[in-house]
Amino acid sequence: LGNVLVCVLAHHFGKEFTPQVQAAYQKVVAGVANALAHKYH
């Protein structure tokens, strides 16, 4: 689900969605997913 969100953001922002921005969003999404996994596992 997190990767889908990143894809939607990339499509929405176009050229403004640089590899650096993608890396930042991927890091946030991974952190949130990890936190949720630990809370509900």
UniProtKB/Swiss-Prot annotation:
GO MF, one annotated term: organic acid binding
Subunit structure comment from the entry: Heterotetramer of two alpha chains and two beta chains.
Family as reported in the entry's similarity comment: Belongs to the globin family.
Coiled-coil segments on the chain, per record: none
InterPro entries in alphabetical order: Globin, Globin-like_sf, Globin/Proto, Hemoglobin_oxygen_transport
Naturally occurring in which organism (per UniProt): Colobus guereza (Mantled guereza)
Keywords assigned: Acetylation, Heme, Iron, Metal-binding, Oxygen transport, Transport
Post-translational modification N6-acetyllysine, affected residues: 39
Cellular component, GO, one term: hemoglobin complex
Tissue expression from the record: Red blood cells.
Purpose: Involved in oxygen transport from the lung to the various peripheral tissues.
Biological processes, Gene Ontology terms: hydrogen peroxide catabolic process
Record's protein name: Hemoglobin subunit beta
Domain Globin, first and last residues per copy: 1-41
PROSITE patterns assigned to the protein according to its UniProt record, in alphabetical order: GLOBIN (PS01033)
